[in-house]
Amino acid sequence: MTACWIAVTNAGGAAGFPFPPVDVGHVAPVVDALADRLDPDRSRILVARIGGSLAGWVVLRRDASPLIAHWGVVNHLQTQLTYRNEGIGSALMRRLREVARDDMRLEQLHLAVRGGMGLEAFYSRLGWRVTGRWPGKLRLAPDDTRDEVLMILAPL
């Protein structure tokens, strides 16, 4: 997962590290922290493999608070660069929806994407809808400020 995340980030992907380049020293501790928080009821990592190799992965989390325990948050969807445009991301998101609904008993999913990357269109094709945006929230460089776009998938 670490190698995938490094490659995706350094290729300009919006997967959690906004300031490339990154290396193992940046990414490995974050992957370790994700793994440490895994819990069947609250946090899962779904992976896609092709021929035994990691093709992509995504994180699904549920908050511990009973107030919002009915919805999940999706983070870090990414595919290996060699498997781009082969439907891996879409397949991961379809499977994530099933896991959220059938295994974790979630009722809705939320995510936030970086504006200006075409991600809204990708998620919209999978049934997600935009619920709002934080204009100018993400400052990637002095001359590159983007909206953070909030999306929901409901019902599952």
What do the PLM-derived regions correspond to, one by one?
Residues 3-76, 80-81, 93-95, 99, ...:
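Acetyl-CoA-dependent GNAT
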Residues 111, 129, 134-156:
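Terminal substrate-recognition subdomain of acyl/acetyltransferases
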Residues 84, 109-120, 137-142:
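Conserved beta-strand-loop-alpha-helix junction that forms the acyl-donor binding cleft
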Residues 93, 100-113:
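Conserved GNAT acetyl-CoA-binding A-motif
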Residues 86, 90, 102, 115-133:
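Conserved active-site alpha-helix within GNAT-family acetyltransferase domains
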